[in-house]
Each structure stands twice: as C-alpha cells, then as structure tokens.
Amino acid sequence: MTDRYAVFGNPISHSKSPFIHGQFAAPTQESLTYEAILAPVDGFEASLTAFFNAGGKGANVTVPFKEQAFALCDSISPEAKLAGAVNTLSLLADGTIRGDNTDGLGLVADLIANLGSLQDQRVLLIGAGGAARGCILPLLNAGIAQLTISNRTHTKAQLLVDIFTSVDNGAYVSKVTAVEMSELAGEFDIIINSTSASLAGELPPLPAHIITTQTVCYDMMYGASVTAFNQWALSQGAAKVIDGLGMLVGQAAKSFTLWRGIEPDTQVVLTLLRDKLMAEPK
C-alpha cells in the first residue's frame, strides 16, 4: 500500500518539497506519494482533516499555517514548543497528531555539513520572526558558545530572548542575549540572516565591522544567484557564505526520518536541487 504525504501552504505552487521527498524515497524503495496542497487561508484545518481522513500519514506545513498547525497537535516536540509553530505533522497509530519543527534542525545539519562542527562558536542571529525562533534550541543543542539575537525592532529580539528564558531549564539562559543592531560589537564566528530581506534585494541595517576574514555568513534565503545578504558579506571580507537551500533539504530530511525511520542522503539531493534551480528561467 502506498503511503500519502503532502505539504500544505498558500501559496504552494513554488514548493520544492514534492521533488525533494520524491528523491529521498527513490533509492530506498519506499512506497509513498508526496503532493503539494493549496489550502484556503481560512480552511487549513478542514483541508488537513480531509487529508488525514483519506489516509494521509504525515504532512509538512509552510506559510501561513505553521501556527495553526501547532494548535491542532495533540503532542509536540521541544523544538516545536519553543518555536510556537510546527512544520511537520505525523498521524500516530492511536489517531493523535504529533507536531515537530525541523527548520532549526535542518539549519544546524547544513551548517555542520559545511563547517564540520558548531562547538563553541559565537553566533549572531539576525531577525526575530518565526524562522529565528525555530532555530534557537537546535543551535544551542549543537554546542555553540553564545547566541546574540538582533532585530531591526529591538523589542522583538528581546521578546524572543524572554520567551526562550521562560521555557529553558536554566542550562542555556546565560548564552542568549538580545542586542540592538546599532550596538553590535565584537566578533562573531557565524552570522545567520533569518530575515527575508534578500528576496527584495535588501539588507538588514548591520554595521560592517561585525564581519571579519574569519566570519561565516549564512542567509536562510536562496536563489539561482548569490543572495543580497551574502553578496554584502563577501564585499565585507567574509571567509565563507552559505545560502539556505541546504537548510531546505535538511529540514525535509528530518521530516522524512520522522515519518519513515530512514535518514536520506541530503548531499545528493542538494546537488540535484541546485542544478534544477540554476536551470529555471530567470
């Protein structure tokens, strides 16, 4: 019997998830289908319920439904709890729905694939939205030394720190701080841009001095060409820049493992996806 999976969003036609999961399944002989489902903005719950009632086993969730999906879960992972959102839903044997957030896990997996280790790294996280919130715990669990969060609106960055502090057991509280962009000082080993500014060709208002010849810069956005943030980072002398395509594949791989119990080969799929992206009409 073929198991059904899907990704829900609005819009959704641009989604690369069906291609990614199809590539994950092919070498494993896993019998499954994976489709993109356009859910009405006011009809996500009904669409999801219909999918599960028709035999769906699991689903990914993207904009704008991640918070709604969180509210529908019977159980959630620690990462999802802190993120306040889920991107992966699993229908369990007892009929309940488990929610996970694999976005931050995908980011960490891609960083480790590129850098080898995150142990004792000093990380600056730009942005304080859902993408940033979902990455805090995975980054800390990876062994980083400190996490500085900075956002155009400082109160949002501080709120993110406060939310984390309220749910943390005390092990990481001293490692997480919020700093205004204009007051950023010192050196960072890794700078992560979680904002969508690059999609509009824009940049967060960051001081150039925070980038050194040792700094690795990571933009969660991606495209056929170098993103605006990564172009700026290179112009300031960054040691290395990485875009978010590997994070996309990484979070999908974590979802696939949750559903199927198999760890897919992400590097092969990332290469295929990069080639596919480069071949798309500009």
UniProtKB/Swiss-Prot annotation:
EC class (word): oxidoreductase
Residues that coordinate or bind NADP(+):
G127, A128, G129, G130, A131, N151, R152, T153, H154, T155, K156, M220, G244
Question: What's a single GO BP term from this record?
Answer: aromatic amino acid family biosynthetic process
Q: Where are the transmembrane segments?
A: none
What SUPFAM superfamilies would the database entry show? Aminoacid dehydrogenase-like, N-terminal domain (SSF53223), NAD(P)-binding Rossmann-fold domains (SSF51735)
Q: Which GO terms describe its molecular function?
A: NADP binding; shikimate 3-dehydrogenase (NADP+) activity
Positions contributing to shikimate binding: S15, K16, S17, T62, N87, D103, Y222
UniProt-listed Pfam families: SDH_C (PF18317), Shikimate_DH (PF01488), Shikimate_dh_N (PF08501)
Q: Looking at the UniProt record for this protein, which Gene Ontology cellular component terms does it annotate, in alphabetical order?
A: cytosol
Give the EC number(s) under which this enzyme is classified. 1.1.1.25
Q: Which UniProt keywords apply?
A: Amino-acid biosynthesis, Aromatic amino acid biosynthesis, NADP, Oxidoreductase
Q: Which residues form the active site?
A: K66 (proton acceptor)
UniProt pathway: Metabolic intermediate biosynthesis; chorismate biosynthesis; chorismate from D-erythrose 4-phosphate and phosphoenolpyruvate: step 4/7
Query: What CDD domains does the record point to?
Result: NAD_bind_Shikimate_DH
Subunit structure, as described in the record:
Homodimer.
Q: What is this protein called?
A: Shikimate dehydrogenase (NADP(+))
This protein's species is Shewanella baltica (strain OS185)
Query: Encoded by which gene?
Result: aroE
